[in-house]
């Protein structure tokens, strides 16, 4: 009779227990089994792609001071005073900061590659134009980013087997993406009901991208929802009203804009639940950007921010220090002495201090669903179970063929 130790089930139990022990010993290294980061999205994750794609005679605002002042001490193409959420995730995983793919010469993409472009939309610009929504910053939509990734695989990883191994062992950041689809519409004062009509199209596009990457071998995805945009200085300026009923009496946000974000996030989570059922062997983590940021506006002093968290650090004019025609990075636009005291950096994007707290809420707190550490553990288990991986690959192929 075979010993209990020879049984696959017991070996798996022993492995899980040993992994849990190692994880509990050092929480800072709990996710180091990921080999790289692959990122798609917009300005929330752009580490320099829009800058790399731009004409030297027509550079984006992120190419000019004070962007980058806090951590890098010079502009890097990031729309913040310092690091972004993707940067803090990379540091947590023990990786170098993820380099931008576009326009980046001699970059080392072994530990990560970033296709996120500031101004990018989930939907094609032509789709938005047909609905009277003008997107003029970039045409590098989510599908274009995904196509760039697919076409670059021979240079990133070489052989098909090496590429599949890279994708399987990567943490794939799917966004934030989709926010600009709504921003461009709302900045044009489109009725919110009309903006809501975009939601199923945006979600279907994100879902399709995840499915395509799953079929390429993707096993772990971090998919963010939208921020509570009712706290954005840009929207508070654009939609300023004397009707006090539209504002939250405690925080001063525009309630209807936050309601829209909640509506979108709920629909996105329902779609992710469907994908989890279709691909039970894949870790699809919802990143709750909404609540991770919301707490900073609700209790600013608790997190080290000044008691007026709504105005932008960098900007000019009005109650919220924001003006669409004189934005951060423009000549003569002032900026605060200490960005770490602000949540809002330029009226649209957050400060490094805010992004740090959001990242900690995802990596160590309750704002990743399921919790981030368990997703890492699942990835480690799958890496150790070669036989089961072959079975899952067969199931995956069947699932992809049904799509």
Curated annotation (Swiss-Prot):
It is found in: Secreted. One of its GO terms (molecular function) is hydrolase activity, acting on ester bonds. The active site is at residues 43, 346, 349. Belongs to the 'GDSL' lipolytic enzyme family. Its EC number is 3.1.1.-. GO terms for biological process: lipid catabolic process. The keyword Oxidoreductase does not apply. Residues 1-27 form the signal peptide. It comes from the Eukaryota. SUPFAM superfamilies: SGNH hydrolase. It holds the Pfam family Lipase_GDSL. Its main location: secreted. GO terms for cellular component: extracellular region. This is GDSL esterase/lipase At1g28590. It comes from Arabidopsis thaliana. Keywords: Glycoprotein, Hydrolase, Lipid degradation, Lipid metabolism, Secreted, Signal. InterPro entries: GDSL, SGNH_hydro_sf, SGNH_plant_lipase-like. The keyword Magnesium does not apply. Gene3D superfamilies: SGNH hydrolase (3.40.50.1110). Glycans are attached at residues 139, 323.
């Amino acid at each position: 009779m075979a010993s209990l130790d020879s049984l696959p089930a017991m070996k798996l139990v022993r492995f899980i227990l040993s992994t849990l022990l190692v994880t509990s010993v050092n929480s800072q290294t709990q996710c180091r089994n990921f080999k790289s980061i692959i990122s798609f999205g917009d300005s929330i994750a752009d580490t320099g792609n829009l800058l790399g794609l731009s004409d030297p005679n027509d550079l984006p605002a992120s190419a000019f001071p004070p962007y980058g002042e806090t951590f890098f001490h010079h502009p890097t193409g990031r729309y913040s005073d310092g690091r972004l959420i993707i940067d803090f995730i990379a540091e947590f995983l023990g990786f170098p900061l993820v380099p931008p793919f576009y326009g980046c010469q001699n970059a080392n993409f072994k530990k990560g590659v970033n296709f996120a472009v500031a101004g990018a939309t989930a939907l094609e610009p032509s789709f938005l134009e047909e609905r009277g929504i003008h997107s003029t910053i970039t045409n590098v939509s989510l599908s274009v980013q995904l196509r760039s990734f697919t076409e670059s695989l021979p240079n990133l990883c070489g052989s098909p087997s090496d590429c599949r191994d890279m994708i399987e062992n990567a943490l794939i950041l799917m966004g934030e993406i989709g926010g600009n689809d709504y921003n461009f519409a709302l900045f044009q004062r489109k009725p919110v009901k009309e903006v809501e009509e975009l939601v199923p199209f945006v979600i279907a596009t994100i879902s399709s991208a995840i499915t395509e990457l799953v079929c390429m071998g993707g096993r772990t995805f971090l998919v963010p929802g939208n921020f509570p945009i009712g706290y954005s200085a840009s929207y508070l300026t654009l939609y300023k009203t004397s009707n006090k009923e539209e504002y939250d009496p405690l925080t001063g946000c525009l309630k209807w804009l936050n309601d829209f974000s909640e509506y979108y996030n709920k629909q996105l989570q329902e779609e992710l639940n469907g994908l989890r059922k279709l691909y039970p062997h894949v870790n699809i983590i919802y990143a709750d950007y909404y609540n991770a940021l919301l707490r900073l506006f609700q209790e600013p002093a608790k997190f080290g921010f000044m008691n007026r968290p709504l105005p932008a650090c960098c900007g000019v004019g009005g109650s919220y220090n924001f003006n669409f025609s004189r934005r951060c990075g423009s000549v003569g636009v002032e900026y605060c002495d200490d960005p770490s005291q602000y949540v809002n950096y330029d009226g649209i994007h957050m400060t490094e201090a805010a992004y740090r707290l959001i990242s900690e809420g995802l990596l160590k707190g309750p704002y990743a669903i399921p919790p981030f550490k368990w997703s890492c553990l699942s990835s480690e288990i799958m890496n150790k179970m070669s036989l089961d991986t072959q079975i899952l690959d067969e199931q995956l192929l069947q699932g992809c063929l049904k799509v």
